[in-house]
């Protein structure tokens, strides 16, 4: 999941610090999520999707 969020940020020119500001999370939490070092909680995922203005199923594949 984190890799997909990172790929989205990279492809849209969005910095992790911007996402941290928009979600209220620390830079280190966003970094850990993007690197796959932290499992994302439901509330965190919701806030990330809301900040990026994407639907909740955006980062899910049919396989997930």
Language-model segments: residues:
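A short, Lys/Arg-rich alpha-helix, primarily the initiator
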Residues: 1-15
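Short C-terminal boundary/hinge segments that cap the last helix of small helical domains
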Residues: 53-64
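Short, basic-rich loop-to-helix N-cap that marks the start of a DNA-contacting helix
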Residues: 37-47
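Short alpha-helical DNA-recognition segment
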Residues: 14-32
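The alpha-helix within a helix-turn-helix
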Residues: 9, 20, 49
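DNA major-groove recognition helix of helix-turn-helix
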Residues: 9, 34, 44, 63
């Amino acid at each position: 999941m984190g890799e997909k969020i990172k790929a989205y940020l990279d492809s849209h020119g969005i910095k992790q610090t911007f996402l941290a500001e928009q979600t209220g999370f620390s830079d280190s939490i966003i970094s850990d999520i993007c690197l796959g070092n932290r499992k994302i909680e439901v509330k965190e995922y919701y806030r990330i999707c809301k900040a990026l203005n994407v639907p909740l199923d955006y980062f899910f594949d049919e396989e997930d």
